[in-house]
Amino acid sequence: MNIRFLIRSAARRDLESLMRLAPQASLVNLPPDEDVLTIKIARSLQAFSTSPPASAEYLFVLEDVASKEVMGTSLIIARYATPRTPHYFFEVRDTPGGQELALGVCTSGLSAIGGLVLDRRYRGMPEKRGKQISLIRFVFMGMQPQRFEPTVLSELMTPVAPDGSNHFWDALGGRFTGMSYAEAFELTRQKSRDFIPRHFPVTPISLPREECGLQRNRDQVLDSGKPEQRILEKVGFSFSRRVDPMDGALHYETRLADISIVKNGRYCRVSETTRESCGQSALLGFMHGDRFFGGQYPVQVNADNAALPGEVMALLGLKSGQQVYLSLLD
């Protein structure tokens, strides 16, 4: 393992890097908009403070310390569903003739993860940097569970056409609202989803078997999203049989307390050792003031002591006896 990478909370200096990464993924919560990203960084800095707002969003970046290059991002939204910003979904129900979609709404009890982007140049490598920047969110949630809701949601995107259209939207939402997918996407980015209860039917929508392209199941995930799907399933998430009413994105959910990274996490005191002495691998995280640092590193855990290679201690600025939150990996 090349020990020159760390994960940290986003800083103002990361704006240029985020502007470079954002176009690589069509994400509502990480758009390639300088003004929006500037606000997101400021909101994240406030979130990591000792008294975060209820609407906190936590933005993480994966950095190559040698080159000072940011190559990945991920995000936690502490309160994803509120009375002011409801979370709408379709519940997927199997019927003798196919499926039906029933509109539902949630206004509390839900945190969400998103904003996952890994620079294309680093995808498919054995170090699995994307897995690290994804799982680090659960390290922080394990450190500070009181900041989050009991249930955690991740939306896994379904395919979008080369021209930017979405078959699911064109067949359903576009028909009900008269809007294009791009128009609806922009409203969603602005956290304005009032058009859904205004225009969508309250009675279930039938999808006959011949409409197989509209029916939802766990296999309908973008190829680029399948690694994240496998990661989520391994740590405890499953398809909730709910989908986004706009684009049909699959909703993966679990209880925060049931996420394996959280269940297996604990605080340890660190000490220094050699890399050769470390026969385990772990995700770890800690706060330095209002800033988060962490990553995946070799370790040797004995009771409440975690021995780390000297180069990891130096990279993270850790001192012997300092406390970190740690979750061993298989």
For the regions a protein language model found, what residue spans apply to each?
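A short beta-loop-alpha structural element at the N-terminal edge
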Residues: L6-L18
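Active-site rim helix/loop that mediates acceptor-substrate recognition in acyltransferases
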Residues: P31-M71, L75-P83
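Conserved beta-strand-loop-alpha-helix junction that forms the acyl-donor binding cleft
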Residues: G114-R121, P150-S165, L214-K226
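Conserved acetyl-CoA-binding loop-helix of GNAT-fold acetyltransferases
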Residues: L118, G124-M141
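Long, charge-rich alpha-helical interaction segments
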Residues: L172, Y181-H199, I205-Q220
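Anionic-ligand-binding alpha/beta catalytic cores of soluble enzymes and soluble regulatory domains
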Residues: S206-T274
